[in-house]
């Protein structure tokens, strides 16, 4: 009987470990396997975006396994909170970056946080170090007029949405990723976007464009308007007067429902329902007495 000890130097994730034991005299052997889950202090739980008492941005982390809370994770690691009031937070999967310890390309799950007028950082869920910010995500420092809204992971890669358009980056470990990838982003495609982003189909994401004032979809390399489905004769939205309020994606009984909520000046609120990959399927003008027609904080239930 031996006590085995083996150092684990693996990325966060779930692995299958196979052990083989061989009898030196007979040559008989036996195999056994087990699952190994590699985690970090910041990889299993929930991030809570918050405004600090002095008006800046930080996050608390709730560890779901240990039922504990780590407060102020940005300030505790970075030495100070992120400047400006919090705006948005997104998970970014398989984000490529250069590991400063090895100077080689690698990848990790990140948390994209925007604050103030145009500040953002991508923090590693391994140790909350900064993977990228305004000074490092592009091949040159980001233009002062660019406003990043969100970074979203999709089938083709990670997409940065800003008022300049969409920038696409390969997923680390994916079939298109190169061992020489740096994670930096090139020129944007299309026109200005917003923070209202949802799925659309297996390849594309839908979003509200603040520049074209239309619902659009993108694969990261181009943009197209989402039009009413063929033969649509229902209620329509005056896009020029519409202001986005919320968006969501619901999955129920095997059906995906993607929706956007708009406030139209002088008319009230409308719910726009998309048919995945097929255009605008339905528009519902809300009764002014409904809570949804007046609420300030709205969230969608992703899975019922």
Region spans (language model):
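Beta-strand-enriched, solvent-exposed domains that form extended recognition/catalytic surfaces
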Residues: 1-42
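Low-complexity, repetitive regions of proteins mediating host interaction that are extracellular
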Residues: 1, 64-65, 146
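Residue-level signal for short segments within beta-strands and strand-turn junctions
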Residues: 23, 61-63, 275, 287
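An edge-strand/N-cap motif at the start of beta-rich repeat modules
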Residues: 35-65
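Surface-exposed assembly/interface segments
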Residues: 83-96
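Preference for solvent-exposed, low-hydrophobicity sequence contexts
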Residues: 68-69, 73-77, 96-304
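Short, flexible N-terminal segments of the mature chain
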Residues: 60-86
């Amino acid at each position: 009987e031996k006590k085995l000890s083996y150092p684990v130097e693996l990325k966060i994730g779930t692995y299958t470990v196979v052990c083989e034991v061989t009898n030196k005299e007979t040559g008989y052997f036996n195999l056994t396997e087990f699952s190994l889950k590699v985690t970090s202090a910041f990889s299993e739980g929930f991030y809570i975006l918050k405004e600090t008492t002095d008006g800046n941005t930080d996050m608390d982390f709730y560890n779901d396994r240990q039922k504990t809370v780590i407060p102020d994770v940005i300030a505790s690691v970075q030495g100070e909170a992120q400047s400006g009031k919090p705006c948005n937070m997104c998970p970014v999967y398989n984000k490529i970056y250069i590991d400063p310890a090895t100077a080689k390309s690698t990848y990790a799950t990140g948390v994209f946080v925007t604050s103030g007028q145009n500040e953002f950082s991508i923090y590693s869920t391994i140790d909350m170090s900064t993977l990228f910010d305004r000074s490092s995500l592009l091949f040159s420092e980001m233009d002062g007029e660019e406003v990043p809204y969100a970074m979203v992971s999709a089938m083709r890669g990670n997409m940065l949405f800003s008022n300049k358009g969409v920038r696409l980056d390969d997923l680390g470990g994916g079939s298109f990723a190169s061992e020489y990838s740096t994670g930096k982003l090139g020129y944007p495609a299309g026109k200005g976007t917003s923070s209202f982003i949802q799925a659309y189909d297996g390849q594309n994401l839908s979003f509200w464009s603040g520049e074209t004032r239309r619902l659009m979809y993108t694969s990261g390399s181009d943009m197209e308007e989402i039009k009413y489905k063929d033969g649509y004769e229902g209620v329509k939205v005056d896009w020029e007067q519409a202001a986005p309020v919320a968006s969501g994606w619901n999955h129920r009984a095997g059906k995906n429902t993607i929706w956007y909520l708009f406030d139209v000046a002088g008319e009230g609120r409308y719910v726009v329902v998309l048919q995945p990959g097929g255009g605008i399927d339905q528009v519902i003008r809300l009764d002014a007495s409904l809570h949804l027609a007046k609420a300030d904080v709205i969230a969608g239930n992703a899975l019922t």
